[in-house]
Amino acid sequence: MTAQTTAPALLTLDVEDWEHANYSQLDVSSVAAARKGRNYAMDQNTDRWIEICAGFQASSTCFVLGEFARRYPEAGKRLHSAGHEIASHCDTHALVYEMKQEEFRENLKRGLAAVGDLTGVAPLGFRAPSWSVSPTRTPWFFEELARAGLRYDSSEFPVWTPLFGRFGAPVVPYFEHGVLRVPVSVIQFLGMRMPFSSGAFFRLSPFWLLRAGFSSVTARGLPPMIVLHPRELDPGHPRLPIAGWEGQVHYARMASV
């Protein structure tokens, strides 16, 4: 009989509601129409997250959207009281690279205030909605994080996809403008980088790939990062009007979580 050990992982939750998404098929009116008449309470899923983590004596970092914090303030307080770190996911789910620097500064300021009001503590971390930052389109990004007093960022997706990410981005933590960057975990597979533990990739990855990914990242001396969303804890949540591959990315294998 051999002893089994478990390696630490970075468990993270992007705390947002079911309609917070960025796809070409969506606009303000279509999202508003989808939400009209829906009384779904996403805070039941953050409470479920607390229960799951408590069952494994685990804590997580929760990147809370300002809009969510104002809509469900008690949910954020319960996450904090349960020992989860509360960080910022910006104020709205707008794409950062579509904002001007001043717009982002104000959006970030509102988001930090909303989250800080929940805990009485200034957040130290940030993750951009849909990983929407890049050196070319948001060259001022870290200047603004540092200005706001943030210590670390988890907006780096080191694989290009049609929705986000970039080729050649570092896969290990590094500092930029005094802010620690913590990239999403990836695995080398058939000579290519492959994400496996974040959102849709976590849901779509077979168990053998998840296991290989965790082992590969751990062997490099790094803790694997897991990224989930409250909506992924309930396959029955309301749906947005998105079809095709975007709909598959957003909803495929929801029950697998």
Feature names for model-found ranges:
Residues 1-190, 208-257:
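Catalytic alpha-helical scaffold of carbohydrate-active enzymes acting on polysaccharides/glycoconjugates
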Residues 36, 127, 194-204:
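Surface-exposed cleft-lining segments at the edges of enzyme active sites
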